[in-house]
From Swiss-Prot:
GO terms for molecular function: nucleotide binding; uronate dehydrogenase activity. Keywords: NAD, Nucleotide-binding, Oxidoreductase. NAD(+) binds at residues 17-18, 37-39, 55-56, 75-79, 144, 170. It catalyses: beta-D-galacturonate + NAD(+) = D-galactaro-1,5-lactone + NADH + H(+); beta-D-glucuronate + NAD(+) = D-glucaro-1,5-lactone + NADH + H(+). Activity increases with increasing temperatures between 4 and 42 degrees Celsius. Activity is below 20% of the maximum after exposure at 37 degrees Celsius for 30 minutes. Its EC number is 1.1.1.203. The keyword Metal-binding does not apply. Substrate binds at residues 79, 115-117, 169, 178. It comes from Pseudomonas putida (strain ATCC 47054 / DSM 6125 / CFBP 8728 / NCIMB 11950 / KT2440). This is Uronate dehydrogenase. Optimum pH is about 7.
Length: 268
């Protein structure tokens, strides 16, 4: 990691599953880590932390939240499939509000938590790179496609650079056969964020967030300039995962890269 940390970093979604992990892992990257979520956060702000409750759907609140930060790690929003109306505010309005606030306050680097669900309708026997047409598998995936488009637009129009991480499955360990291919360890996630923050000239880069798993569906050649070299592998957990009852061959988790998201809903 660089020896010159940021003065103030903003982490949205800090009360979420990955947000809690990153709160602990990112402390050395800035003099002050500003933490934000719509949900209460515990523990209270510690040394070199600021805790701010913020609804991403509230444009004025997001504008205030972003003031004074040097870079943004945007992990806030709904992180699973829901009705479109529930995703609209935090994921679609929210990402626009974050980028507008970044523009107004002169923030030039953002890490955007995108998702493998932007391409979830590709089949598991297909190998794709970041230039493959997107095939979202859900309203959630659709919202992440929009977020990537916002990132692209704000770079082309305003020079705000973004690394969009299409996160696979970031958990302590893979939980099923699909995750043997999509698993992203916490250490490798942090490495991706580090490379996204400190690599010069990223423009808008899309990178697939997966560890060094034996079976891979995603080709990161278009993000090679980041220098991301995953250190972990799902092979450590293969025996335990394969000991579980196997899903049917036509189960969505065995057919589509996005797994069960491809058949979630409809929501009335």
């Amino acid at each position: 990691m660089t020896t010159t940390p940021f003065n103030r970093l903003l982490l949205t979604g800090a009360a979420g599953g990955l947000g809690k992990v990153l709160r602990e892992r990112l402390k050395g990257y800035a003099e002050v880590l500003r933490l934000s979520d719509i949900s209460p956060m515990a523990p209270a702000a510690g040394p070199h932390e600021e805790v701010i409750t913020c609804d991403l759907a509230d444009k004025a609140a997001v504008h205030t939240l972003v003031e004074g930060v040097d870079a943004i790690i945007h992990f806030g929003g709904v992180s699973t499939e829901h009705a479109f109306e529930e995703i609209l505010g935090p994921n679609i309005c929210g990402v626009f509000h974050v980028y507008e606030a970044a523009r107004k306050h002169g923030v030039k680097r953002i890490i955007f938590a995108s998702s493998n669900h932007t391409i979830g309708f590709y089949r598991q026997d297909e190998r794709i790179d970041a230039h493959a047409p997107r095939r979202p598998d859900s309203y959630y995936g659709l919202s992440k496609c929009y977020g990537e488009d916002v990132a692209s637009f704000y770079f082309d129009r305003y020079g705000i650079e973004t690394v969009s991480i299409r996160i696979g499955s970031s958990f302590p360990q893979p939980q099923n056969l699909r995750m043997l291919c999509t698993w992203l360890s916490y250490d490798d996630l942090v490495q991706l964020i580090e490379r996204g923050l400190f690599t010069p000239g990223v423009g808008h880069t899309i990178v697939y967030g997966a560890s060094d798993n034996r079976t891979v569906w995603w080709d990161n050649r278009h993000a090679a300039h980041l220098g991301y070299v995953p250190k972990d592998s799902s092979e450590t957990f293969r025996a335990a995962v394969e000991a579980q009852p196997a899903p049917a061959a036509d189960d969505p988790s065995m057919v589509y890269q996005g797994g069960a998201f491809a058949v979630a809903g409809p929501f009335n």
